[in-house]
Amino acid sequence: AKEAGIDICLISKGDSIEINDASGSRSTANEEADGIMCLYPGPCDTALDRNDMCLVLKLTDGRFSGIFGGDISSEVEKKLVNEYGDELSVDFYKANHHGSRYSGSADWIEALSPRWAAVSCAAENRYGHPADEAMDRLMDAKCRILYTMQSGQIKYKESAIYENNRQ
């Protein structure tokens, strides 16, 4: 990244990243404004499974919010629900750990209450992702589920979700 002239930014819980709008002007990112907020891990967090040290990021742009938790398990989800509660509510959820049965707990989904969820996984992958029980929890929450194995690329643009260039 450095050779390509890309800035590297190390973040942890409580840090935020400003979002530039289309005009190039910057907004100040904080808990109330547009930006990306890191919810986890903090400098003192530890885990036996390195997947549980993935960044958990919440994106807010004024019209839209989404949460991205990498490969965290239900154990980290539980910590976050206990800490943030209703503040976790979002429009969009990128399913943790490719829709693994070890993530996407009922309490997590209830706290997020997403309208859309994206599951990133290949068809017929060796892990069996996504797990039926994880998808059932999303369906029980009346969440529209998008799968990259069916739709390919999923994009967010101007407060809309697009599957492979279809809204």
What are these regions (language model features)?
Residues 1-167:
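Non-globular, low-confidence helical/coil segments that flank catalytic cores
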